[in-house]
From Swiss-Prot:
It comes from Coxiella burnetii (strain RSA 331 / Henzerling II). The keyword Magnesium applies. Belongs to the IPP transferase family. GO terms for molecular function: ATP binding; tRNA dimethylallyltransferase activity. The record marks 103, 125 as: Interaction with substrate tRNA. One of its GO terms (biological process) is tRNA modification. Keywords: ATP-binding, Magnesium, Nucleotide-binding, Transferase, tRNA processing. This is tRNA dimethylallyltransferase. The keyword Nucleus does not apply. InterPro entries: Dimethylallyltransferase (IPR039657), IPT (IPR018022), P-loop_NTPase (IPR027417). Substrate binds at residues 14-19. Monomer.
Length: 311
């Protein structure tokens, strides 16, 4: 019988309702929330990351939010160390860690450690090959440079095999190949992981929600938030914080590369692509219980499930 303590992981694509559900669960069960989000770690990235607001944070605190400046490239390895520290602190308080977010690589290294690069989806591989046949591998290399400049710098523009593999990693996981380079020393944590996946059954529901949420962000002064970052003078578009979906597109708008409508269109499209990559990874997740974002009795379903397995 497994005597290791529980960790509950609430995963899902962007805009699926994870934060609301997590706060509701933390008010009903002895949970303390740890954010598993590669963008929420940054101070000043609030509106565009859908970070919990002050009222929500007063109701239920979230660990690993607002812990570093956008000028600092926060890594998966640093997350592993920070998360382990927070998990131990919560254990001492006789509470259960509730890990919530959509950065799948972070969940992966906590639960499974890191031994090898993930395998690519055959559909993703075929798509890349078709694009290369149409535009050439040099063009694909240019695109790789935009999303993973470190890997692109190490790969010859004519090395089709390595370009394809680097692009497969990004398309499948949403993380650049270079982010995996320092992870081989990390081992899976000795806990019982309870994996909950929150996602809508209807893809159009998620697409509409993503569009509405981004438009609401714009109404909530998202442009001004990015402008403050832009005007600092010490940040640039190659930093992970500024490459975050939404921020990247508004940055290009502020620099004159996009007009307003193009910025909006590109941001919504990029967010939908992010959700698609997250779902691709989640469908392969072992031992996970799926819940439908659209269910009206979602909270009671999840609470009943957790109580049913002994929590």
């Amino acid at each position: 019988m497994n005597k290791n303590p529980f960790i509950v992981c609430l995963m899902g694509p962007t805009a699926s309702g994870k934060t609301d559900l997590a706060i509701a669960l933390a008010r009903k069960l002895p949970f303390e929330i740890i954010s598993v989000d590669s963008a929420m770690v940054y101070r000043g990235l609030d509106i565009g990351t859908a970070k919990p607001n002050e009222e929500e944070l007063q109701l239920t605190s979230h660990r690993l939010i607002n812990i570093c400046d956008p000028s600092f490239p926060y890594s998966a390895g640093q997350f592993y160390k920070d998360a382990l520290s927070e998990i131990k602190t919560i254990e001492i308080r006789n509470r259960t860690p509730l890990l919530v977010g959509g950065t799948m690589l972070y969940f992966h290294i906590l639960e499974q450690g890191f031994s090898d690069l993930p395998t690519a989806d055959e559909t993703v591989r075929k798509k890349i090959q078709e694009e290369a046949a149409q535009h050439g591998w040099a063009k694909i290399h240019e695109r790789l440079n935009a999303i993973d400049p470190k890997s692109a710098a190490r790969i010859n523009p004519n090395d089709a095999q390595r370009i394809q593999r680097a692009f497969e990693i990004y398309e499948t996981t949403g993380q650049p190949l270079s982010s995996y380079q320092s992870l081989k020393r990390f081992k899976a944590l000795p806990y019982q992981f309870i994996n909950l996946i929150l996602a809508p059954e209807n893809r159009s529901w998620l697409h509409q929600r993503i569009e509405k949420r981004f438009d609401q962000m714009l109404k909530n002064n998202f442009l001004e938030e990015v402008r403050q970052l832009y005007n600092r003078g010490d940040l640039n578009s190659d930093l992970p914080a500024i490459r975050t979906v939404g921020y990247r597109q508004v940055w290009k708008y502020l620099s004159g590369e996009y007009d307003y409508e193009m910025m909006r269109h590109k941001a919504i499209a990029a967010t939908r692509q992010l959700a698609k990559r997250q779902l691709t990874w989640l469908r392969r997740w072992p031992d996970a219980k799926w819940f439908n974002s659209e269910d009206k009795d979602l909270i009671s379903q999840v609470v009943d499930y957790l109580k049913g397995i002994g929590m």
